[in-house]
């Protein structure tokens, strides 16, 4: 009988322990269900949140485009489309105002061309060196320098062009005006070097090492591997970096506003003062153009032209990147 009660006591303890385990398991299941429900809610909410953010971006772009279009249409009610895009005289003030955009287009394209003549060779050579030749120690030094160049405010570049580069160029080039298109073009090129170098280096770094090793195994030199294997394989990304650099140069504002002057000359003489589209926008917005006037609407017409230019450049970059992309 005593043994029976002992066994019964042990059995009861075992049953109690089992019941406690069941309760713990139930609590864990309930907690898991609760956490699972929270995670499922989060999983459902995140895509919706991302969709809202994407819609905000699209709506913002659409709002900018609608604003530009509406005011540009109002401008072309007063100034003919042909006069605007073929006129070589821009005199927005006075009774006989003329609104030819060619002086601004010339200044913009010349400054951008000068900038890319500086940025493309230096940026590409820098990218090739960092990707193919530089040691880790050298890369750790050059990378921060490029990042510093990319982070300098453009107004600082503008004063650098006006107070440092222009005096040097005037001592070399006779007849160079105090404000000209050459000096800001050169400084814009210096500003764009980090963009071209960084994007081109990324494109070169994406080329598999197997292609380099295969060329070296066939007896090619390091120089031949770089320029006949690696660079052609990365050409889509390199060209895209050039096009994006041009787009950046076209949209630059402060450098040309400070260093190129405000003369609306239709000329191809790099020694003369010229005005770009962005500088004209700054001039008009900083002036006393009354709302509803032709001068006021010309601001939006020029801005719309600038928008189309940069959009075309970005589309070209995307097309080139897709057209010549290599699959590895």
How would you describe each model-predicted region?
Residues 147-192:
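Generic hydrophobic transmembrane alpha-helix motif, especially the helices
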Residues 256-307:
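Interhelical loop and adjacent transmembrane-helix boundary motif
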Residues 31-48, 69-115, 135-136, 283-296:
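Periplasmic/extracellular loop-to-transmembrane helix junction in inner-membrane transport proteins
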Residues 201-205, 209, 216, 286, ...:
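C-terminal transmembrane helix and the adjacent membrane-cytosol boundary/short C-terminal tail
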Residues 199-200, 204, 222-260:
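Transmembrane alpha-helices
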Residues 47, 122-161, 199, 327:
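Cytoplasmic-entry segments and transmembrane alpha-helices of multi-pass inner-membrane transporters
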Residues 2-54, 317-328:
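Transmembrane alpha-helical segments of polytopic membrane transport and secretion proteins
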């Amino acid at each position: 009988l005593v043994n029976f009660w002992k066994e019964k006591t042990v059995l009861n303890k075992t049953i109690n322990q089992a019941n406690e385990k069941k309760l713990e398991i139930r609590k864990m299941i309930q907690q898991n269900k609760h956490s699972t429900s929270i995670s499922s809610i989060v999983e459902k909410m995140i895509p919706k949140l991302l969709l809202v953010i994407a819609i905000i971006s699209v709506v913002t772009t659409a709002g900018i485009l609608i604003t530009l279009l509406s005011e540009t249409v109002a401008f072309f009610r007063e100034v003919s489309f042909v006069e605007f895009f073929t006129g070589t005289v821009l005199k927005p003030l006075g009774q006989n105002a003329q609104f030819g955009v060619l002086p601004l287009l010339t200044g913009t394209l010349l400054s951008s061309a000068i900038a890319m003549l500086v940025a493309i060779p230096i940026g590409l050579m820098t990218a090739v060196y960092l990707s193919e030749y530089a040691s880790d120690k050298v890369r750790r030094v050059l990378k921060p320098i490029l990042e510093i160049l990319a982070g300098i405010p453009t107004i600082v570049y503008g004063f650098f062009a006006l107070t440092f580069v222009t005096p040097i160029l005037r001592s070399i080039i006779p007849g160079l005006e105090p404000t000209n298109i050459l000096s800001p073009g050169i400084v814009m090129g210096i500003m764009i070097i980090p963009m071209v170098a960084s994007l081109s280096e990324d494109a070169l770094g994406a080329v598999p090492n197997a292609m380099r090793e295969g060329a070296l195994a066939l007896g090619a030199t390091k120089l031949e591997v770089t320029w006949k294997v690696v660079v052609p394989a990365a050409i889509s990304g390199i060209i895209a970096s050039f096009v994006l650099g041009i787009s950046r140069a076209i949209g630059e504002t402060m450098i040309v506003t400070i260093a190129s002057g405000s003369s609306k000359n239709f000329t191809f003489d790099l020694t003369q003062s010229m005005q770009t589209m962005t500088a004209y926008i700054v001039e008009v917005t900083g002036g006393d153009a009354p709302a509803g006037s032709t001068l006021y609407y010309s601001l939006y017409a020029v801005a719309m032209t600038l928008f189309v230019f940069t959009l075309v450049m970005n589309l070209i970059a995307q097309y080139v990147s897709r057209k010549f992309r290599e699959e590895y």
